[in-house]
Amino acid sequence: MTWRLSAWRGTVQVVALTVVLTGCAQAPKPMYHWEGYQRGVYEFLKGDGISADEQLNQMLAQAEKARGRDAALPPGFRAHVGLLQLQAGRVDEARDSFMAEKTAFPEASHYMDFLLAKMGAG
């Protein structure tokens, strides 16, 4: 009888310790800094949201925030910034953004090369 009570107590203690440790665990850090990016792309494609300049400023602020948190920008972020920069007539900055997207995500190389070729940047 004493052995059963002792085993039961041990089991309860292990379960309680597991619950406490699991409850204190931190959530995993997201792989990318998505804050506002998806909404911004939606507004851009919808066409009746904020102006390209306003959205560009918001996205550049998001990029700064991501750098401050040492978080990676999501796939397509730099490319979208580049498209906004093109719309604003900032061709050199757009080229730099497309090249940065190509470097960060090599799988986007074909599309970035296409956009760069359309710009005459080869």
Where are these regions (language model features)?
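Flexible helix-coil transition and linker loops at the boundaries of alpha-helical arrays
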Residues: 29-30, 63-72
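Sec-dependent bacterial lipoprotein signal peptides
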Residues: 1-24
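Bacterial Sec signal peptide processing site at the extreme N-terminus
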Residues: 18-41
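Structural register within alpha-helical repeat arrays
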Residues: 80-81
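TPR/TPR-like alpha-solenoid helical repeat scaffolds
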Residues: 45, 109-122
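Helix-turn-helix repeat elements of alpha-solenoid scaffolds
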Residues: 47-61
